[in-house]
Amino acid sequence: MTDATAMPLRSFLFTPANHPRRVEKVFEVGADAVILDLEDAVAVSEKAGARQCVVDAFSARPNSGTQYYVRVNSIDTPYCEEDIKATVGPWLHGVVLPKVESGSCLNRAEQWLAAAEAACGMTLGQLDLMPIIETAAGVESAKEIATTNSRIRRMAFGGGDYTLDLNYEWNADEAVLAYARAKLSHAARLGNLEPPIDTVVLQIRDDERFLQSARYGKQFGFGGKLCIHPSQVPLTHDVF
């Protein structure tokens, strides 16, 4: 696989790994990176099958020009280690780790990634590890997270869980996200990382709100957007 640093990544498009029709379509919309999701969108009873879907989907499409990521379950679940073991291979560019709150979270994931790379005959450190910062604890630990592991190339921000964690009202002006965005931007700079990737926008039929959110993120030094609908990809590219 091509090194994930070879191109700037602006759009990261999520789709549930356990929905074959959605998986087929996600490769057709021109996203810079595709993230097949094993976390929020996949029921516990379907996680094992979804892991195989990740491998099948990515290994069938080598050298597409799109970067391939998998979002595993968080480090404090019983699923994360097996998610990594089952999906890592030469078809993958990186792993998205949700709900990261400290450097120790990354160190545990690093051990599992290194073992999986070795088992597949891959170069140690080949895979990107992208933490999503989406809690108050994660935001306050952003500098530690950004400087803990050389595998990290960029961080991402999850506004949904962040605002739930703090009981904030997430309105269109996104004032409640300003502090977290600033913290992540500062941390990325101090860690010599690429610009962070901004939060999803849940209102998938409101293009103007998405564009406004993307512009706010860009003002804070972010380099792209997490997307949850194909229509958000070209909007992301319009801003970044």
Give the residues covered by each predicted segment.
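Expand to "…catalyze enediolate/carbanion chemistry for C-C bond making/breaking, isomerization
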Residues: 1-240
